[in-house]
UniProtKB/Swiss-Prot annotation:
UniProt subcellular location: Cytoplasm
This protein's encoding gene: metG
Function of the molecule: Is required not only for elongation of protein synthesis but also for the initiation of all mRNA translation through initiator tRNA(fMet) aminoacylation.
Subunit structure: Homodimer.
Name of the protein this chain belongs to: Methionine--tRNA ligase
Residue ranges of domain tRNA-binding in the record: 609-713
Organism: Colwellia psychrerythraea (strain 34H / ATCC BAA-681) (Vibrio psychroerythus)
Residues at which Zn(2+) binds: C162, C165, C175, C178
Alphabetical GO biological process terms: methionyl-tRNA aminoacylation
Cofactor: Zn(2+)
Amino acid sequence: MSDTTLSEATSNTASHSLAEKRKILVTCALPYANGSIHLGHMLEHIQTDIWVRFQRMRGHETYFVCADDAHGTPIMLKAQELGITPEEMINGVREERIKEFSDFHISFDNYHTTHSDENKEYSEKIYNALHAKGHIKTRIISQLYDPEKGMFLADRFVKGTCPKCKSEDENGDSCDNCGATYSPTEVLNPRSAISGATPILKDSEHYFFDLPAFETMLSDWIRSGALQEEVANKLTEWFEQGLKQWDISRDAPYFGFEIPNAPGKFFYVWLDAPIGYMGSFKNLCDKDSTIDFDSFWNKNSDAELYHFIGKDIINFHSLFWPAMLEGADFRKPTAVFAHGFVTVNGEKMSKSKGTFIKGRTYLDHLNPEYLRYYYATKLTHKIDDLDLNLEDFVQRVNSDLVGKVVNIASRCASFITKRFDGMLSTNIDDQALADEVMAAGDSIAAHYESRDFGRGMREIMALADKVNEYIAIKEPWQLVKDETKQQEVQDICSLGINMFRTLMIYLKPVLPVLADSTAAFLNDELVWEGHKTLLTDHKINKFKALLQRVDMDKVNAMTDASKDSLGAPVEEEKKPAKKKKAAKVVDNSAALADPLAADPISEEIEFDDFAKIDLRIVKIINAEHVEKADKLIQLTLALNEEGTETRQVFAGIKSAYNPEDLIGKHTVMVANLAPRKMRFGMSEGMVLAAGPGDKDLWILNPDDGAKAGMRVK
């Protein structure tokens, strides 16, 4: 075999040199060890894993560690409820987590626990360093105390009447009824949520970290580029209000590490939780002597340290954690990347609706790579929430992965294996197309690096559309009937296979298992630098189905399995079967004879109303039938000629057009129409068409010279 390289015109476009090998340590937030992982957790772990896999593909020394957050009162109480020790409980949870993350293809180098010797060592080391420098303070505070359980009560374990609106059975620090916030000591008729006893007020000495001593450093650090801009802006509120000392101790009984020289006092879980990153990495270093712990954590380390977290724990990672590290003479994070929450079908996860989906429940029904891809299409570098729309999920995965990417291989492979003994041609049928797909590697790499995965996926799918368009125009299935065209068939299908290979290189961080199957089929290792080459005079293996379509019935079964049991189901009253409607005969003769009379001009509007509509020229780069939809065609519309900015639109033009006849045409769309959730997925705009309907519909075609992206005025 031989490799043909990207043509000279595009061979020097790389924007990131690989000559400099980076040292990178990456972490996810530590999931709390008292419950099951759900799809909200999986967003962060998938996001981080994609970024880590990309860095590894680029040849950088990259380590990915995590651990269970295994301390605190909730774990202690849960273990008591189960009749086991906290250690037994967290060990069982950890084993379950390791298996679950592995099944989602999360490629941790180490998954540890905060209840470890390593974490205890570094928690004490950091605390002692802070104490020696005068950054630990003590004072007496008053708290509610459960006399039956013999323990102080955290806010969450106090219930009572709201002091503002007098609503009963409200939380110890906030009221769900009126939204008020208050101190647990202000609650009327308080009771312990643990025992039901009436708590008493009791004094205790607590230990505090002197966060205000680090105000200048933190103020500079949050504006250093280590945080997203919106996060840094939000944190300025803390400085405006004045930083407060942070309570880092809890009284016995408590499951955690006892504070040195302070009997009966324990580190608050949020002190030792982030130190768990160090503990897990130290555990990895102890198992692999080639990794030097200090070179990653020393104050002057040249390694990169990144934390991926949810937006709800920004304060701990962006104020308390860097201040602790600074005070103990360790390095601070290179960056903290925060993401938003997951909603399902536009709403908060709900057990009653079956949308509070546990990781294992998902795995019991669906391929994890479906979720990895869908999350990737939605992820950006911002902290916006991400909606898992289950119908759009099915449509997007089936359309993009099965209908576009894998479809390229399935259209071309059989010709190569059956007629040419699996050998790819030495000829390149369309050098311009090959160069365009190969040259996209630099911009796609930039999207991965900046965590703009959604933009990267759109660029990859736009390329897939162009390759499918190329194959559709060339029609190798027609050419193969002509014995004089066999070389042309081999050339066309060889280029198709090569373009599929390049696209799978780009998708490998997202779809590692599909990439492995592709590598076996192509008899070639998919490495990042391979995007600059083509396989010529190379033998491939017999094609096997690489990916199955998502079945909506399996999605429904998953949500059914996620619903709370609400008692025995009530048998529905049996209804007579509906009669099948006769086909509707549409008569448009009057509308065609006098369109204005049949459809009079609408009510007059002001110019400002019209000016709100943003009409753009677009290029149709893909068109497909929509399963179980009588009227719809799914269009992929490019808003630029390069095809890197695309929109998905469902258009009711099936009665008038065959999808394949639309590919390559230019038309007009309403580009600023709010996305609309449809049964078959999300429609991101509207194309314009004329005519009364049914077969009498004509989409608008601009004159030659109009380019995708141009505004229609």
